[in-house]
């Protein structure tokens, strides 16, 4: 009887679930944020029109091969619709749900980390977002994250770079 009581008491010390971040990372581990946007309205792409109208290719085929219906104004729609700068989600984080993510630190040599703290957001899948316009100065910003779930906390250091230019 005493052995059963000891066995049951020992089970209470086990932390439920797990959290693994040793393979965590971003497919694209950096993002360029432009201070000066190209707001030129896009114009029709003559190459796209030639492929579709003359050669008979479908618009879908052209887009899949990097030939788009318009050219120019790379940030025109970003400005017009207020689309934020966004990263890809982080990959390789495994564990018992829910897993919470937060920014652990932001480091920079030339920029201003405090200003980046004010505008940078991270969502539950590790996607970073910044508003189209901000007062973050030019520089390279290294970001570290903290992942937390029930009973576990792990850091992923210097996992993403934001280049403001």
Region spans (language model):
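C-terminal motif of bacterial Sec signal peptides marking the signal peptidase cleavage site
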Residues: 6-10
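Non-catalytic macromolecular-recognition regions in eukaryotic signaling proteins
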Residues: 12-165
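Sec-dependent signal peptide recognition
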Residues: 1-2
């Amino acid at each position: 009887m005493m052995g059963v009581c000891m066995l049951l008491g020992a089970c209470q010390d086990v932390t439920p679930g797990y959290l693994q971040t040793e393979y965590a990372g971003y497919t694209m581990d950096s993002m360029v944020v432009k201070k000066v946007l190209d707001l030129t309205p896009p114009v029709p792409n003559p190459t796209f029109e030639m492929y579709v109208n003359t050669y008979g290719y479908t618009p879908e085929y052209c887009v899949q091969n990097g030939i788009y219906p318009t050219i120019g104004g790379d940030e025109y729609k970003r400005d017009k619709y207020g689309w934020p700068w966004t990263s890809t989600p982080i990959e390789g984080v495994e564990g018992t749900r829910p897993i919470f993510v937060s920014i652990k630190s932001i480091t920079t040599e030339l920029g201003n980390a405090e200003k980046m703290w004010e505008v940078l957001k991270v969502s539950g899948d590790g996607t970073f977002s910044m508003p189209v316009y901000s007062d973050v100065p030019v520089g390279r910003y290294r970001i570290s994250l903290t992942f937390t779930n029930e009973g576990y906390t792990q850091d992923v250091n210097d996992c993403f770079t934001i280049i403001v230019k």
